[in-house]
UniProtKB/Swiss-Prot annotation:
Pathway: Purine metabolism; IMP biosynthesis via de novo pathway; 5-formamido-1-(5-phospho-D-ribosyl)imidazole-4-carboxamide from 5-amino-1-(5-phospho-D-ribosyl)imidazole-4-carboxamide (formate route): step 1/1. It comes from Methanothermobacter thermautotrophicus (strain ATCC 29096 / DSM 1053 / JCM 10044 / NBRC 100330 / Delta H) (Methanobacterium thermoautotrophicum). Residues 118-350 form the ATP-grasp domain. This is 5-formaminoimidazole-4-carboxamide-1-(beta)-D-ribofuranosyl 5'-monophosphate synthetase. Disulfide bonds: none annotated. The lineage of its organism: Archaea, Methanobacteriati, Methanobacteriota, Methanomada group, Methanobacteria. The gene is purP. InterPro entries: ATP-grasp, ATP_grasp_subdomain_1, IMP_biosynth_PurP, IMP_biosynth_PurP_C, IMP_biosynth_PurP_N, PreATP-grasp_dom_sf. ATP binds at residues 148-210, 232.
Length: 363
């Protein structure tokens, strides 16, 4: 299977009418503000939607066209791709698109012009590649253990792919690691292949900041668009139980993301945040060309020493951007209007079309 040929994508794009572009996405994750932002910037919109899940897009009136499919993964089917291309569609990727379409399909046989860098999506999904990119950027990341037998302090254990925190757990010893792995296997939460690919890293205690950036090729600038923190089940409920009672409850903590809330960072920490974003863009341009174009997110913890430590990244629109569909504290400072991440993407597309530079932002 050969990779999608960029020249073929550009040929498809060349056949589009610049005055009749449709911004399209999969109906999940962050599609509401992607679609709404596109309409705000004057584009037609289309949503590829699983049957039975169309209500939000109808009731919020964000989609002009609906492509109904039996299951989300059908977005890669030839007939769906044909329909998207017939609308002059530019696809805006998000976490659900990556999960349902699948990286192999996105990289090898999805011939619809896509905003951003389709090659970098694998780098957020595979832990070793993600770590390589963050190391190249020179930002602080947790220490990684290559063998459970090496565990000598509290660690966080994660598994491949974007799972919204599902299956993550904390362990303080090799014995505890093995016990929790066995329990999760019995429950069917993970597979033997997951165990082989388990990512074990130093647990960072601190406060959570998920920092949302946008790198604009049009302006050659990294914009800090907003920040959020996450609601996680069941750990958020457990910590509300008195410590003496927690010990008596036979309930394993889990870290499944169930929601997001906006946050503002201490102002003296912002130089660190900007520096981290700049470093990530510079590193990505070197090792995953054309680079970190468009939205990306660094998921971080800030320690009591006021050091920001990055434990994960998203190389596309992150779910936390749903907290500022009307704009954030930070996007207001830069744009002076209600600028969601979806609208920022659409504006980049609009400016690129007006300046005849669409090939620079499409892969």
């Amino acid at each position: 299977m050969s990779k999608v040929n960029r020249d073929e994508i550009l040929d498809i794009l060349e056949g589009y009418s610049r005055e009749d572009i449709t911004v399209a996405t999969l109906g999940s994750h962050t599609s509401l503000h992607i679609l709404n932002g596109a309409k705000q910037e004057g584009f037609k919109t289309a949503v590829v939607c699983e049957k039975g899940r169309e209500v939000p897009y109808q009731r919020f009136r964000v989609a002009d066209e609906f492509i109904m499919v039996d299951k989300f993964s059908d977005i890669v089917n030839d007939d769906v791709q044909d329909e998207l291309r017939s609308m002059n569609s530019i696809i805006v990727p998000h976490g659900s698109f990556v999960a349902y379409a699948g990286l192999d399909h996105i990289e090898n046989d999805f011939y619809v012009p896509m905003f951003g860098n389709r090659d970098i999506l694998r780098w957020e999904s595979e832990r070793d590649l993600e770590r390589k990119l963050m190391e190249e950027a020179g930002i602080r990341i947790p220490f990684k253990y290559t063998d459970p037998e090496e565990i000598d302090r509290t660690v966080m254990v994660k598994f491949p792919g974007a799972r919204g925190g599902r299956g993550y757990f904390v362990a303080s010893s090799t014995e505890e690691f093995n016990e929790k792995i066995d329990s999760m296997l019995e429950r069917g939460w993970i597979t033997e292949d997951d165990v082989k690919d388990a990512h074990i890293e130093e647990y960072i205690a601190g406060t959570n900041f998920c920092i949302h950036y946008f790198y604009s090729i049009m302006n050659d600038e990294v914009e800090l668009m907003g920040m959020d923190s996450r609601f996680e089940s069941n750990i958020d409920g457990l910590v509300r139980i008195p410590a003496r009672d927690q010990l008596d409850i036979n309930l394993d903590p889990s870290y499944v993301i169930t929601g997001n809330h906006p946050v503002a960072m201490r102002e003296s920490l912002l130089p660190q945040a900007f520096d981290m974003g700049d470093r990530m863009v510079e590193a990505a341009s070197k090792i995953v060309p054309p680079g970190m174009n468009g939205p990306f997110c660094l998921q971080t913890m800030c320690t009591d020493n006021l050091e920001i430590v990055t434990f994960e990244m998203s190389a596309r629109t992150d779910g936390g951007t749903n907290t500022f569909m009307h704009g954030s504290t930070y996007s207001y400072l830069l744009h002076g209007e209600g600028m969601s991440m979806g609208r920022r993407v659409a504006r980049e597309i609009r400016v690129a079309a007006e300046q005849d530079r669409l090939p620079e932002i499409i892969t």
